[in-house]
A protein has these predicted regions:
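Positively charged n-region of N-terminal signal peptides that target proteins for export
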Residues: 1-5
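Bacterial N-terminal signal peptides
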Residues: 7-17
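Noncatalytic, solvent-exposed loop/strand surfaces
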Residues: 18-205
């Protein structure tokens, strides 16, 4: 199934004073509760109302965008054959300018082959949200792998050390705990919690 994803930025983000502005670098925001400190947020928006820019995103993905250093960063799974029933996917990280919506970089980190385990039709191959920590972008694509990039889209490391067969695909977003990235695995035969070292991507436990 082909879906169109649109990324839009509402006026509140661009009119917020730098004194109170805060990066939204993880899923559900800096406090983890989904609550924003921004005041007077618009409650209505449309094509010509309270929207500064909108761009059509490549591919599919349920991941939420994160905002760091005037960049909007999101993951995507782009089908190599969009109209085919089965296709290989390019798993990528994409960044846009918060102020203009201009594409800043697009980094492909994994290729999912046609033979990869299938997922639920309502899930995507790019569902976990990126995490930005100390100038690095950490992305997780479930059983397809995990990677670390710079804020310029340069690959620092990637790993497929944690392999498992998924049931419905992946949706769990990693969290940062000290010097590790922790995420859950809900596989057909394996259910566990994994920690990777932030510096190398090696499995800590």
């Amino acid at each position: 199934m082909y879906r169109i994803r649109v990324l839009l930025v509402v006026s509140a983000f661009l009119f917020t004073s730098p004194v109170v502005a805060q990066d939204w670098s993880v899923f559900r925001g800096p406090s983890g509760d989904g609550v924003s400190e921004y005041k007077n947020l618009p409650i209505e928006w449309g094509v010509d109302k309270n929207v500064f820019w909108a761009v059509e995103l490549p591919g599919d993905g349920w991941s939420s965008p994160v905002v760091v250093d005037d960049q909007v960063i999101v993951t995507s799974a782009v089908a190599q054959q969009p109209t085919a029933e089965k296709s290989a996917y390019d798993l990528a990280v994409v960044a846009y300018s918060l102020k203009t919506g201009k594409a800043l970089w697009n980094s492909k980190v994994f290729v999912q082959p046609e033979t990869a385990p299938r997922i639920h039709q309502k899930n995507s191959h790019a569902s976990p949200t990126p995490v930005v920590h100390k100038g690095r972008v950490y992305v997780h694509f479930g059983h397809q792998g995990t990677a670390c990039l710079s804020l310029k889209g340069e690959l620092i490391w990637k790993t497929v050390a944690v392999e498992y067969k998924p049931v419905h695909g992946n949706g769990g977003t990693p969290i940062i705990v000290n010097d590790t990235m922790v995420f859950s695995i809900d596989g057909a035969a394996t259910t566990q919690v994994v920690a990777l070292e932030l510096a190398t991507g090696n499995v800590r436990w």
